[in-house]
């Protein structure tokens, strides 16, 4: 059978940075932290460079079959990711010196409620990227984590309105009954305004170093949620909702606050050579989003 990729010469010569496939759907067993592998439904991209300016093209089936072997006979961890990239280059030894792979999937975690001890599933979007170039291996991990953000400015304005309502209610009284105030504060006439809040999402990308023996997906998610303190919940009873309201009231934040809190936490981590983050507050007051971005700020590192 004719093999055009091997036998034909390019009509127009030139080297290409990446050639391969995207939007490959496949199941994967993913090894994270110290947990048993979890099956995920992934979307993959695989590429090698075309370093021979005269070659017609690469051998895409060689990349696909190696990816399929990983899916059916192994699990995705740092070791197999390295081997996969090396296999891409070896199978194209006459054409390529660099390889790239990207996996996108949702990673499911059981999350406990704040007070009631109930549990539910949460799905976190995850991206794993591997690069191999002339023996230099790099791996990136990205997670997206939803949380709630309550506007500090709106909270201050709401408090002012409550103060004004209190003054109007009791301004003419020289003595105020404690029980009456207690009941008034628990009524809609007492709490006349509430601050606006919204579901928000932070995207965090880190470059892993040799201290990582596996993908620290859960560790990174836990770090983000612990830092922000208001993660979106799964199973919720009334006592959990009340605790969530308390956490939001005690952790008011602009997008700048969220970005700085995470920046500080990520700077303390030794497993990450670099980091990049983007905070997205999907405003309930405005028709636009409030966004803050930052990086570790190292030379030659990520750019915002």
Swiss-Prot record:
- Quickly give the catalysed reaction: GTP + H2O = 7,8-dihydroneopterin 3'-triphosphate + formate + H(+)
Query: What does UniProt give as the signal peptide span?
Result: none
Sites marked May be catalytically important: 151
Can you provide one Gene Ontology molecular function annotated for this UniProt record?
GTP cyclohydrolase I activity
**Which domain of life, per UniProt?**
Bacteria
Q: What is its EC number?
A: 3.5.4.16
Any Pfam family the entry gives: GCHY-1
A GO BP entry: tetrahydrofolate biosynthetic process
Q: Does the keyword Hydrolase apply?
A: yes
**Which Gene3D superfamilies does the UniProt record give?**
Urate Oxidase
EC class of this enzyme?
A: hydrolase
UniProt keywords, alphabetically: Hydrolase
Q: In which pathway does it act?
A: Cofactor biosynthesis; 7,8-dihydroneopterin triphosphate biosynthesis; 7,8-dihydroneopterin triphosphate from GTP: step 1/1
The record's family statement is:
Belongs to the GTP cyclohydrolase IV family.
What function does this protein fulfil?
Converts GTP to 7,8-dihydroneopterin triphosphate.
What is this protein's record name? GTP cyclohydrolase FolE2
Lineage runs: Bacteria, Pseudomonadati, Pseudomonadota, Gammaproteobacteria, Alteromonadales
